């Protein structure tokens, strides 16, 4: 994100229709033409004197000075015909993306004037259609026509023009009621109030008041060398199914029939749905024949998880987690992924679980900490840690060492860890999160760092503030190499960790996740440990018909609870 520079900023304002330009006809609002002519009469949208002096065309307007040395000029491109946004489809949004592509080199940014009813769908669709976007695209509209005495349209449109003209925010955004949202994170939440949109799971990219506040850390970074790519081959045979208590399996079956290729299924709470066998069977049959189903919560905030058995059942039926995506974003993403040519079904499913345009926050994504080597920060830290001779310097160094050691271990930076050792640092100290460097290295799967720390004699069974051991973190991260090193050094799961493993083992068995079961066994867990309902992983696998898992577990029945071998000789099926 950067502040736009230059004496003039040229924008293209694409008017598709919507309430902002509507007029009353026979007592109802219908799309109204001639928006540029209306804006020309409003001094806040057009400096007639400056336009006359510049000899601007009729469709190009100029805002009053936005700053001392900068003017924002904008050309209004009116679609023919105009649309009520309720009539918009993927085809119209593809045309809109292609319009932006045609004019991409002529303008510094783009404002799309769109009806509010489907604006969140439009913003989500455009975010996936426009790849490698390096200019600002903002959708806006109004709840009341702009020519009305009391209208939100004037503030919304002016705010969108100012944001697109003054800042380079290389995303598809939505501006409404003084807030700039990431487009694929926004949803409409009110039919009448001016604060019609919100971004339930991500803070606004910017807020406008007496000052403009940009949340710079949220703005996505782009590759400055990549050119804009417009994806026009969006799959149109996708749908949205909202579950409700008691929904008949026959209704679900009817909905999931061809030619449907993908479904966003809105579920209860954190991704839960009815666990009736006939309904789960319909979902399983559909996913096994290649239908892609994405699970999104119908709650406004929060994410889909498998904390509950009902959510686990959805995953077991082949339904893909939508994490914290809005339904609008999930539908757009599904359309985009299924529309890409030449991809296997497995690759498409994998793409749906990845963050492609900032549309979701996968729970596996952890904060990345930079390496302490090879950068300016590393040089400054090395200098700071080498300070001695004063009480203040020693106190500062001692306070920083635990966090720096954990950062180095998390990055797998053995050289930085060795540098800390040479300065006399204790690599067994805990950081502000209550974790040791061994926790950080185990979580990241860094075998070299783990080896180095074990050679330094750190406590292999140390617990963090949550009671987690490095071994448990390695199991959760599925790092068999690290698990083997820790086990050889005497690591073991605690009684609490083993007791809580039962439910997780059942979840893995239900999902036919052999890799997950193997790392637990390698860590010394009893795979016969029952879950919260008293059933074991073997019982769950048998009930789910996961024969490979059943065979694996039965092969271990004679050695349940025994010491697991090293990772090189894990049992297979």
Curated annotation (Swiss-Prot):
Job of this protein: Exhibits lysophospholipase, transacylase, PAF acetylhydrolase and asparaginase activities. Can catalyze three types of transacylation reactions: (1) acyl transfer from 1-acyl-sn-glycero-3-phosphocholine (1-acyl-GPC) to the sn-1(3) positions of glycerol and 2-acylglycerol (sn-1 to -1(3) transfer), (2) acyl transfer from 1-acyl-GPC to the sn-2 positions of 1-acyl-GPC, 1-acyl-sn-glycero-3-phosphoethanolamine (1-acyl-GPE), and other lysophospholipids (sn-1 to -2 transfer) and (3) acyl transfer from 2-acyl-GPC to the sn-1 position of 2-acyl-GPC and 2-acyl-GPE (sn-2 to -1 transfer).
PROSITE patterns in the cross-refs: ANK_REP_REGION (PS50297), ANK_REPEAT (PS50088), ASN_GLN_ASE_2 (PS00917), ASN_GLN_ASE_3 (PS51732)
Keywords from the named record: Acyltransferase, ANK repeat, Hydrolase, Lipid degradation, Lipid metabolism, Repeat, Transferase
SUPFAM superfamilies in the record: Ankyrin repeat, Glutaminase/Asparaginase
ANK repeats: 141-170, 399-429, 433-462, 466-495, 533-562
EC number: 3.1.1.5, 3.5.1.1, 3.1.1.47
Catalytic activity, reaction form: a 1-acyl-sn-glycero-3-phosphocholine + H2O = sn-glycerol 3-phosphocholine + a fatty acid + H(+); L-asparagine + H2O = L-aspartate + NH4(+); a 1-O-alkyl-2-acetyl-sn-glycero-3-phosphocholine + H2O = a 1-O-alkyl-sn-glycero-3-phosphocholine + acetate + H(+); 1-hexadecanoyl-sn-glycero-3-phosphocholine + H2O = sn-glycerol 3-phosphocholine + hexadecanoate + H(+)
Residues that, per the record, bind substrate: 84-86, 116-117
Origin species: Homo sapiens (Human)
Region (Asparaginase), start-end ranges: 41-350
Domain Asparaginase/glutaminase: 9-355
NCBIfam families the UniProt entry points to: asnASE_I
Metal-binding found in the keyword field: no
Official protein name in the record: 60 kDa lysophospholipase
EC primary class: hydrolase
Transmembrane segments: none
Subunit field text: Monomer.
SMART domains assigned to the protein according to its UniProt record, in alphabetical order: ANK, Asparaginase
PANTHER family (UniProt xref): 60 KDA LYSOPHOSPHOLIPASE (PTHR11707:SF28), L-ASPARAGINASE (PTHR11707)
Record-annotated active site: 19
One cellular component term from this protein's GO annotations in UniProt: cytosol
GO biological process, one term: lipid catabolic process
Family to which this protein belongs: In the N-terminal section; belongs to the asparaginase 1 family.
Molecular-function GO term, any one: asparaginase activity
